[in-house]
Amino acid sequence: MELILKAKDIRVEFKGRDVLDINELEVYDYDRIGLVGANGAGKSTLLRVLLGELTPPGCKMNRLGELAYIPQLDEVTLQEEKDFALVGKLGVEQLNIQTMSGGEETRLKIAQALSAQVHGILADEPTSHLDREGIDFLIGQLKYFTGALLVISHDRYFLDEIVDKIWELKDGKITEYWGNYSDYLRQKEEERKSQAAEYEQFIAERARLERAAEEKRKQARKIEQKAKGSSKKKSTEDGGRLAHQKSIGSKEKKMYNAAKTLEHRIAALGKVEAPEGIRRIRFRQSKALELHNPYPIVGAEINKVFGDKALFENASFQIPLGAKVALTGGNGIGKTTLIQMILNHEEGISISPKAKIGYFAQNGYKYNSNQNVMEFMQKDCDYNISEIRSVLASMGFKQNDIGKSLSVLSGGEIIKLLLAKMLMGRYNILIMDEPSNFLDIPSLEALEILMKEYTGTIVFITHDKRLLENVADVVYEIRDKKINLKH
């Protein structure tokens, strides 16, 4: 293998926190690396360092080949060099950056990178805004790409198909795992089990030593009390009494020394961290929110036209009570329109009178409120503070985040907060438009667990194949102006 990139002593600080603290990284030709980690871990910062856009003091960088960069959406720019055949296959119908959709911009920047003759591609969320067809086409293109690939992505299916090595970025450090994302998950689970066994052994040994030390102290106290009792008695032979007291004192000291030795052994055990457990919550609904209609939402021969474009013609569907229903289909096919038709109770759509619908929109994440996180969650919520904390923790919120004002939260944090609030709200039907967008993988996996355990009905749009497989028990595909039941 030929080395194309080597970096040493990558140290980046931000507001007193070590964002990156990496001794050495190497990228070889034919490497297929997935860079994973929580939002804010420094993944995009690391790509900027490797590209030379950011040069930390003392960092040594050796680039032995040309690199192309697929940036996040808001960084896209038009360039001169393009493979217009590839642009067309990716679905970009025009090149006016001002009027492009998010999906078209994403496809354009991918085409720009693949058009260049480079030794490696660094990609930051390349599947953003792509529909399933676009993602599958991108996977095919990258499989034929002969250079190295280092990619940040929250699409687990994409990572499974493309990468054979995972770099996990956590606490500023990179840990390398061989295999795709599913292989990485299995290795992480083995690590968790090993850590759990080590932690249980540590707790048991510490408890054993603490009991033994306490027993020695207890024995020493008994000897001390015995000595005090015997000193009150008169003895006609002073030498015998003194010898007896010396013997007792020696035993007492021996017991205390044994206790101290055990305490030193406890200290020598060090500290073993408990493994991160999966936080679960038991969702509940009040009697007032119970639905009994087996199909609380039904669409019968609905029609919808935008300008001269018909989205639906005599299309029908029904949403089963308690089901997790996924709406799939290409970009612009009518998925969000169908949700809006349901929310607006448009002609042909019947909704149970007792339905209480919670709605999560793709772009509903702008908040300027000074209300703090816990106050926001507690409003119109029947769950106690402990349960709220549990859900927030599962979505990646730390203890010190609970008191933060909404106005200082990032867009990703607001999205996680809105999803958590909706799941704990006074609803019996949830409608989610691309809930996985902008979530890091840990938060996405936590959301999956919450969605599966939710007791009400969920209708959601997603292009995330793993989310679809893991959560949906009913799947509708919008195609040819119809709403087709897939399973």
UniProtKB/Swiss-Prot annotation:
Annotated region described as P-site tRNA-interaction motif (PtIM), given as residue ranges: 189-274
GO-annotated biological processes: regulation of translation; response to antibiotic; translation
Induction behaviour: Expression is probably tightly controlled in vivo. Transcription induced by erythromycin (ERY) and azithromycin (AZI) but not other tested antibiotics. Expression is induced in the presence of ERY by the MsrDL leader peptide, which stalls ribosomes, preventing formation of a Rho-independent terminator structure and allowing translation of this protein. Negatively regulates its own expression. Probably part of a mefAL-mefA-msrDL-msrD operon, where mefAL also encodes a leader peptide that provides upstream control of expression of the whole operon.
Effect on the protein upon substituting residue 241 to A: Does not restore growth, no change in MIC for ERY
Main localization of the protein described in the UniProt heading: cytoplasm
Protein location: Cytoplasm
SUPFAM superfamilies in UniProt: P-loop containing nucleoside triphosphate hydrolases (SSF52540)
Coiled coil location: 185-233
One term of GO molecular function: ATP binding
Record GO cellular component, one term: cytoplasm
Region (Disordered): 214-249
Family matches, as SMART domains: AAA (SM00382)
Segments for region (Loop): 216-254
Reported effect, residue 244 to A: Does not restore growth, MIC for ERY is 8 uM
Start and end residues of each ABC transporter domain: 5-196, 297-485
Binding positions for ATP per the UniProt entry: 37-44, 329-336
UniProt effect for mutating residue 242 to A: Does not restore growth, MIC for ERY is 8 uM
Function according to Swiss-Prot or TrEMBL: A probable translation factor required for resistance to some antibiotics. Probably interacts with the stalled ribosome to provide antibiotic resistance. Confers resistance to cladinose-containing macrolide and ketolide antibiotics. In E.coli strain DB10 expressing this protein the minimal inhibitory concentration (MIC) for macrolides erythromycin (ERY), and azithromycin (AZI) rises 8-fold (from 2 uM to 16 uM for ERY, from 0.25 uM to 2 uM for AZI) and 2-fold for the ketolide telithromycin (from 1 uM to 2 uM).
Domain notes from UniProt: Composed of 2 ABC transporter domains joined by a PtIM linker (P-site tRNA-interaction motif). Upon dimerization of the ABC domains, the PtIM forms an extended alpha-helix that interacts with the P-site peptidyl-tRNA and extends into the peptidyl transferase center and/or the peptide exit tunnel in the 70S ribosome. Deletion of the PtIM, or of the loop at its extremity, abolishes antibiotic resistance but does not restore full growth in E.coli.
Similarity section: Belongs to the ABC transporter superfamily. ABCF family.
Protein name per UniProt: Probable macrolide resistance translation factor MsrD
Organism of derivation: Streptococcus pneumoniae
Record lineage: Bacteria, Bacillati, Bacillota, Bacilli, Lactobacillales
